[in-house]
């Protein structure tokens, strides 16, 4: 799973930016997140538990014309070969792409449609062995977005 996380970290590197001032770094570290990338334009952090691998990208992009959808499409087209695209859907909060890896694990790419901060886009890779159905997936998306948004000041 760690090898998959590394590949997915690279996949999230679509756009590059420095640790945003609107992120609560103390809270991130308190909740055991590791900083993966801290460059101007893109800030990536993640953590892995027994059940879930989570990688979050916070992007500061000036263009706002349907950028969340564009990011979601970029993740879909830029996925590694060992990640087979299964489906995509959207709910009121996010665009969600589902991938299945050769080892049977699932990766859910979650891109928030709206954020509290202008020009701030959130992209999440949620890796698990579970094959979520629509209602359950919506709950996971809401819970995950709520957690990530709680780190925004």
Task: Show which residues each predicted segment covers.
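N-terminal "mature-domain start" segment
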Residues: 17-45, 80-82, 89, 144-149
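Surface-exposed amphipathic alpha-helical segments
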Residues: 29-33, 126-153
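Short, surface-exposed coil-to-beta transition loops
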Residues: 38-41, 53, 103-111, 120-121
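A short acidic-to-branched-hydrophobic micro-motif
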Residues: 45-70, 121-127
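Short, exposed beta-strand-loop hairpins at the edges of beta-sheets
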Residues: 99-104, 113-140
